[in-house]
Amino acid sequence: MPFTTSIQPRRQRLSLYTAPLHLRHKLFNAKLSPDLQKKLGVKRLPVRRGDTVMIMRGDFKGVTGKVVKVDLKKVRIYVEGATRTNSKGQTVYYPIHPSKVMIIDIDTSDKIRQKIIQRRKKE
């Protein structure tokens, strides 16, 4: 864990809960699909809004959709198709942890992200 060197679980949890937002971005790494791994030469990337992901665990297992929102505070993502109705009868997105999804297609419109992929690429 990049935030602490302690082996005590309580201190590791505390460092996760109190981590600054620029370090929380590291917690959003998700596995890439095998096709993307071969194409990009990278095993995992941080999830971003606009990526297409497949949910691998939980009630919405197998659901594929675009990432609508990324919540850095709660370390959760919101995916099209993973919805429920709240007590008012409104449809709301269900929060999903990024480690429970697999990225199927990435949004490559950002030049900085392309540089990140080139930097992480295995030779």
Swiss-Prot record:
SUPFAM superfamilies, per the entry: Translation proteins SH3-like domain (SSF50104)
The entry's keywords: Ribonucleoprotein, Ribosomal protein, RNA-binding, rRNA-binding
CC annotations in GO: large ribosomal subunit
Signal peptide residue numbers: none
Gene Ontology molecular functions: rRNA binding; structural constituent of ribosome
GO biological process, one term: translation
Protein task: One of two assembly initiator proteins, it binds directly to the 5'-end of the 23S rRNA, where it nucleates assembly of the 50S subunit.
Matching HAMAP family: Ribosomal_uL24_A
Subunit comment: Part of the 50S ribosomal subunit.
Family under the similarity heading: Belongs to the universal ribosomal protein uL24 family.
Protein name: Large ribosomal subunit protein uL24
Species: Pyrobaculum islandicum (strain DSM 4184 / JCM 9189 / GEO3)
